[in-house]
């Protein structure tokens, strides 16, 4: 059985996620620019879907990188 470290959600239950809020979106991206799973970030299903859409939209608009160049 795999145990995941529970992270505290950075969002309140009714808070919406906006693609323009880059600082918030960066909290849910790994150093390899992958979106953190819902299991490990503590978001609800609805919030995770909003988060994924916002991150993808921010990447297309060049607000976030697709891949980090480290």
From Swiss-Prot:
It is found in: Plastid, Chloroplast. Coiled coil: none annotated. Gene3D superfamilies: Ribosomal protein S18. The keyword rRNA-binding applies. GO terms for cellular component: chloroplast; ribonucleoprotein complex; ribosome. It holds the Pfam family Ribosomal_S18. GO terms for molecular function: small ribosomal subunit rRNA binding; structural constituent of ribosome. Keywords: Chloroplast, Plastid, Ribonucleoprotein, Ribosomal protein, RNA-binding, rRNA-binding. One of its GO terms (biological process) is translation. Belongs to the bacterial ribosomal protein bS18 family. Part of the 30S ribosomal subunit. PANTHER family: 30S RIBOSOMAL PROTEIN S18 (PTHR13479), SMALL RIBOSOMAL SUBUNIT PROTEIN BS18M (PTHR13479:SF40). This is Small ribosomal subunit protein bS18c. The lineage of its organism: Eukaryota, Rhodophyta, Florideophyceae, Rhodymeniophycidae, Gracilariales.
């Amino acid at each position: 059985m795999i145990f995941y470290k529970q992270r505290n959600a950075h969002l309140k239950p009714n808070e919406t996620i906006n693609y323009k809020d880059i600082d918030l979106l960066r909290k849910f991206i790994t150093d390899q620019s992958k979106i953190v799973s819902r299991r490990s970030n503590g978001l609800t299903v609805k919030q995770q879907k909003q988060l994924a859409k916002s991150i993808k939209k921010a990447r297309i608009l060049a607000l976030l990188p697709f891949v980090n160049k480290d």
